[in-house]
Amino acid sequence: MRGQQERTGPLFSYISTEERIPASHPLRQVRRLADQALDRLNPTFCKLYPEGGRPSIPPEQQLLALLLQAIYGIRSERMLIEQLDYNLLFRWFVGLNPDDPVWHPTTFTKNRDRLLNEELMAKFLELLLSAPEVKPLLSSEHFSVDGTLLRAWASHSSLERIDGLDDDPPPPSGGRGFGGSSSGTKRAKGDFRGLLLSNQTHRSTSDDEARLFKKAPGVGAFLSFMGHCVMENRNGLVVASEVSQATGKAERDAALRMARSLRGAHQKTLGADKGYDTREFVADLRINGITPHVAQNIQTRRSSAIDGRTARHQGYAQSINARKRIEQVFGWIKQSAGLRQLKARGRSKVGAVFRLHVVAYNLIRITNLLRAQEVMA
């Protein structure tokens, strides 16, 4: 017999959201790991809020919602709240009952200064990695480092001269800069035809900490920041991260800072690509008791800072091979999580957002590793 469609929905539901989520759903493990770390952050959250006044949206719920945004690659906080309103899975993950109202998207804006700071996100990552079931997954000896460009939330049209003067008039029509106005007229805002832009002469008015940087010769320069990660080589988990201004030495300087912060008394190795093959960087690593497993840059006229005493060992080849896995971290963060184009301004805010996405990546990676262990057990 043909069934009839019910046009009027029921007024009540007697099935909880907990029962609707499959027991094998990966978000269950993600939420459990995130809740453990957030519970240990409770003393820090208490210091961020005054004792009196109206109750706020719990900071744990806001951070869980932002983790969802990264995991599912939701483009904006407004779309996140829209999906949080009708998606029972998202409501369950954040801790909202089916009848609870969702908060306004501007809640994230008003709490950004409070919750999205680098120290808090770094502590979140540290507490996640210190969980009892996560510690056995980490290597304390072998690591890899790399950096990636993050497109700043600022366009070329926001560039202005640092000295406050006007740029020279544009070239005449038909010459260099074909199609422009006649010579002698004032240059329109954002018109840089015939000019050589540099970080020494121009600065963005939208984000004065962003810097012009190009990935390779022949590629256009964009206002960017640079994200850095240190990955342990056993299972590809990120153990340290930060964001810096995009400069020629930023990758090596950040790598050295993060390498010094690695804990443990064991002798450590640090794998890196050819861009880190400089005598100064290699010497600094050795001074800090870290064996540099940097890919040899032998295609240039200068000699490599890594000689045969390091390159001859089998461990060096293993580190060079394992180092490539860090590209998967950046690929997920920029492509799947949507951080190729930043939606925050200022190095500190960008650093907090980047670290939050690193936490999201680690949560997914740890969940997959623990599930594989359960299958093999």
Regions inferred by a protein language model and the residue ranges of each:
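Short alpha-helix plus adjacent loop in nuclease-associated cores
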Residues: R112-L116, G315-I320
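Phosphate-backbone recognition surface of nucleic-acid-processing proteins
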Residues: R91-T109, P292-V294, T300-G315
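Basic, amphipathic alpha-helical segments enriched in Lys/Arg and hydrophobic/aromatic residues
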Residues: R279, N288, Y316-A377
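Charged, often Cys/His-bearing segments associated with DNA-binding zinc-finger transcription factors
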Residues: M1-Q36, G177, K186, G190, ...
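Secondary-structure capping and boundary motifs in well-ordered enzyme cores
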Residues: P22, P26, G53-Q61, Y72, ...
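Acidic, metal-coordinating catalytic cores used for nucleic-acid/nucleotide bond scission
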Residues: G53-I57, G271-R279, I298-T300
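Polybasic low-complexity intrinsically disordered regions
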Residues: E82-D85, G95-N288, Y361, T367
